[in-house]
């Protein structure tokens, strides 16, 4: 493969075949030319076709990111050329982002499980490769930080933040709220991750937040509570990027979109409510693990009075 005149080229028998200027796309196309239908890019696409209808939307979105990165890293490999040492190298390559590295490893393991089933490889090279240890997040967002970011958020993001906090649900579930899910009784959810069904009871605060959300783009009728000017639901990554910009504008660091759910469940417990029911967790242990990282014990200090009295008596 050669670079000339602003793009990549594949040369075979004296004939120059143009490839995309983008390196990752060029490598993927090069692999398909050299080993048509047998390269890693082809295997990943075929496996993705099998996976797409079997996983949750959030998982599928993560797999698509992993697929794009693996197509670049393994562009010149055929499936039978990938060895455990190559998988270990991929793990190390993405070590600075252990969460993403683990998603990539999980996806690659699934891809090769299909390759084994289709008898394209003898064994799965991902077996025996350990995942990175992911540090448990213990960041608690204070009320002041929440309000500071909300103040810098554009209107629909501010409304999403409010309803995410007041319902304690995952962002994907909040973005999926349909107008038909909202009633005087509350907001009905079917959690995408667990299929757990619950209704978050309507309160004065939640009702006000829903009312604010309904007036956004009210000239366009959409099926979902939150929608674009074209009537389509907002995508997760669109909202995440807008949220990150609001955090930067507010000067609040290390505030992730998912921290809204953690704050909601932690605050609910402190207010004497039922965080397990609000979070849709099957067991109390799941909720305790989720909240415990964000709770800090409050200890009372000793009083100086006794010390001062001792000093006075000694004098």
What are these regions (language model features)?
Residues 1-19:
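Short, Arg/Lys-rich segments that mark the N-terminal edge of DNA/RNA- and chromatin-recognition modules
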Residues 16-19, 37-40, 49-120, 137, ...:
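N-terminal core-binding DNA-recognition domain of tyrosine site-specific recombinases/integrases
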Residues 99, 117, 159-162, 166, ...:
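C-terminal catalytic core of tyrosine-transesterase DNA break-rejoin enzymes
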Residues 102-104, 117, 121-122, 127-171, ...:
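Basic, Lys/Arg- and aromatic-enriched nucleic-acid-binding interface segment
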Residues 133, 191-195, 279-304:
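Catalytic-site neighborhood detector that most strongly recognizes the C-terminal catalytic loop/helix
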Residues 203-252, 264:
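Active-site/catalytic core of tyrosine-dependent DNA strand-transfer enzymes
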Residues 212-220, 228-231, 285, 302-315:
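C-terminal secondary-structure termini that scaffold catalytic or DNA-interacting sites
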């Amino acid at each position: 493969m050669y670079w000339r005149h602003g793009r990549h080229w594949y040369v075979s028998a004296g004939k120059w075949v143009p490839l995309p200027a983008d390196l990752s796309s060029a490598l993927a196309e090069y692999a398909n030319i050299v080993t048509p239908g047998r390269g890693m890019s082809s295997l990943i696409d075929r496996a993705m076709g099998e996976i797409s209808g079997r996983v949750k939307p959030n998982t599928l979105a993560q797999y698509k990111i992993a697929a794009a990165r693996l197509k670049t890293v393994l562009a010149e490999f055929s499936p039978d050329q990938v060895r455990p040492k190559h998988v270990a190298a991929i793990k190390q390559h993405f070590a600075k982002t252990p969460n993403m590295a683990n998603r990539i490893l999980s996806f690659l393991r699934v891809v090769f499980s299909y390759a084994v089933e289709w008898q394209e490889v003898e064994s799965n090279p991902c077996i025996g490769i350990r995942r990175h240890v992911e540090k448990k997040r213990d960041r608690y967002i204070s009320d002041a930080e929440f309000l500071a970011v909300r103040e810098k958020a554009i209107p629909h993001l501010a409304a999403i933040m409010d309803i995410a906090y007041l319902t304690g649900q995952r962002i994907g579930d909040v973005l999926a709220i349909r107008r038909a899910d909202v009633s005087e009784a509350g907001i009905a959810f079917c959690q995408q991750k667990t299929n757990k069904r619950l209704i978050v009871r309507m309160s004065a605060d939640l009702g006000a937040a829903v009312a604010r959300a309904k007036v956004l783009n009210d000239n366009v009728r959409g099926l979902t509570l939150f929608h674009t000017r074209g009537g389509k639901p907002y995508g997760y990554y669109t909202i995440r990027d807008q949220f990150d910009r609001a955090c930067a504008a507010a000067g609040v660091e290390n505030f992730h979109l998912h921290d809204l759910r953690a704050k909601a469940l932690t605050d609910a417990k402190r207010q004497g409510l039922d965080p397990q029911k609000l979070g849709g967790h099957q067991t109390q242990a799941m909720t305790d693990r989720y909240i415990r990282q964000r709770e800090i014990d409050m200890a009372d200090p000793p009083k100086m009075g006794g010390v001062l009295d001792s000093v006075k008596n000694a004098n």
